[in-house]
Amino acid sequence: MNPQDSALQVRGLTKRFDRLAVDALDLTVRTGEFYALVGPNGAGKTTTLRMVAGLLRPDAGSVAVFGIDALSDPVAAKQMMAWVSDEPMIYDKLTPLEYLEFVAGLWGIDPATSEPAAHRLLASLGLEPHQHERCEGFSKGMRQKVALAGALVHDPRLIILDEPLTGLDAVSARHVKGLLGDRVRSGCTVIMTTHILEVAERMADRIGVIAAGRLVAEGTLAELRQENGHHDTSLEDLFIALVNVEAAAA
């Protein structure tokens, strides 16, 4: 697949810290799909997404976002993407509505456009009753939702999420999953890491399994089952089998 035909194309992505964290990883996410990246702790999931989002410079490899070289033209690439980590960073002294309007201003969005969009985002995440309260008193889950709303205010085409459901209660998780599903149905592309395999199983069009910095399996759930001889198993059992095989081969 050509870079122009995909939302995200990663080739040979490599990063070393004290050890090799990401090992010549190749990854393609198709336009309009929901892609879940799963793997054990320390597998390289977050490091991979941080390099894709332009927050960490790779030692080697390339990243293309809708055909744009994200390493040589990071400004153009970042205009098309949103990044939300599992540790939300927001301005605590602002209310959710003020924060979204502030972020919209950074993107140069006219208030006449940004204010209705901000109200819609807050309502979709169940934050409308709290839109005039300062964020400093919010739980981590509420802060996570404010951060997500802020990341989406410029209507990005590629949404990059690192454990977006961490710290959320069942109601908040449903809000987030509903919003992400709506975005994909409207043509956006989502790539996210998650340890909640049930979420990957239910929401993702395709799933990538990463272990020791390498993509060891990829496909729809049906394809993963067929390729690995686990025709009726859950993603959890399949994941454990794949990771154990990779560990034994290491």
Predicted segments, located by residue:
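ABC ATPase "signature
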Residues: 218-219
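Conserved ABC transporter NBD signature motif
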Residues: 61-72, 76-77
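Helix-to-loop junction immediately C-terminal to a conserved catalytic motif
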Residues: 53
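Conserved catalytic motifs of ABC-family nucleotide-binding domains
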Residues: 155
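Catalytic Walker B motif of ABC-type/P-loop ATPase nucleotide-binding domains
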Residues: 159-163
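Conserved ABC ATPase "signature" region
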Residues: 101, 105, 112-130
